[in-house]
Amino acid sequence: LNYDPLTRYIRRGTWFISESTDMELAYILTKADMPGFQTIGVNSHVFTNAGATIVQEMAFALAIGAEYLDKLTDTDLSIDEILPKMRFNVAVGQNYFMEMAKMRAYRILWANIAKAYGAKEENAKMLIHAFNAQINMSLYDSYVNMLRTTTGSMSAILGGVHSFSVTPFDMVYEPSTEFAERIARNQQLILKEESHFDKVADPAAGSYYIENLTDSLVKAAWDLFLQIQEEGGYLAALRKGTIQKMVKENAAKRLNNVATRREIILGTNQFPNFTETMKSNPEAWVFEANSRRDENAEIDTIETYRVAQQFEQLRYATDVYSQNNKRPVAWMLTYGNLAMLKARANFASNFFACAGFEVVDNAGFKTVEDGIAAAKEVKPEIVVICSSDEEYGEGNALKIYEALKDKAIVVLAGNPEGTADVLKAAGMEYFIHVKSNVLETLQDFQKKLGITK
């Protein structure tokens, strides 16, 4: 039945009816004679999809579980009557070994909590239903989602969940199609019938790496759980805003990591499909965080989102613009050292393709003058200078900039010491390199080109 007013509270900021009435219903559902039914849910996936770390997700889920135990054991229910009626609904991401260790650590910690309440050994087992997290799934190059859901499924199963649902690859941007649902079913069947993932209990046991990861998660999540308990428990921490603050801070950090490509979303902020364009018109919610906050919310709430959304919005704006206008071209002006020009042209091509610009690479011009002449003939919106630092510093980059600055946006691939200062003094604005904030830089290019959301 998955009745979970405590998780609803952090999403909506309100109760179904009131705290006392909601908890009374939890008591009624737990006491009801429904063999085989888990009536009380702990939906930790909310924290996962809101940007929490694995440690935060675990600690907050355990705090919710402990809150239910505290309130229900204050009634005439025993701990051994309560535990079989509880189920944890957990989202699994793409950090393969860490997610595997997460499931193992969850079971250890919940067993410790249950035993502290005096539960029998057989009732101290955590019942986990897992499914794929949506936070890492993407709109563009969406078939990559199949790979994400497959590796996530493997992590969860090898980590020892009781049941698992594969999320259809298109679920994050449209009502799932028959094809996507069929693929999701077949992913599960392949893992069971062909790969025999259901035949071995705890296959990760004994692996030093996974055991060490598990122990690290157990310690870190337990420490944070105790911190929440010291504040008075889950509800008290919510009312103080402690939990929301931690989740939002990590969500902001993660979005920045995606913007600067410290975190890679394949097909979105790195290695995009250069030729893909959005032919349909996704609804606005696809690009927005999902807030379920009620108008009369009593506390701060959290939103779920996907880390790819800002890049997708950027690229979709280019696709929409290109329906009635020429698609902007990022043109590589390559010369000099062959290895360096190729490396920097590849970097720049991936960089600009993330915004949906048409990318044109070149094999390498014999002279700077040849490159300038070709650029004037092609008339691209963006010219990217690609060569080695040494060949930038021979006055070549400055010559290119001076020749083309009034005809295109001129960009340098790299940030060469000394030469960059000379170019900046001459008026060049854009230098793209591994430390660039890719998202903000591409947004600036769109503004200059008149592309709006």
Model-derived features: where do they sit?
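A glycine-rich phosphate-binding loop feature that marks nucleotide/adenosyl-phosphate handling sites
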Residues: 4-8, 43-49, 82-93, 125-135, ...
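Catalytic alpha/beta active-site cores
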Residues: 1-91, 129, 163, 167, ...
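ATP-dependent carboxylate/acyl-activation modules
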Residues: 284-360, 373, 420, 424-426, ...
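Short glycine/threonine-rich loop-to-helix capping motif typified by GTGT followed
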Residues: 52-58, 93-105, 133-146, 174-184, ...
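Intrinsic disorder at enzyme termini
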Residues: 162, 223-328
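Mobile "lid/hinge" segments at catalytic clefts and subdomain interfaces of large enzymes
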Residues: 36-69, 147-225
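Gly/Pro-rich turn-and-neighbor structural signature
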Residues: 57-136, 140-144, 226
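Flexible, glycine/charged-enriched surface loops at secondary-structure junctions
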Residues: 74-85, 116-126, 194-204, 230-241, ...
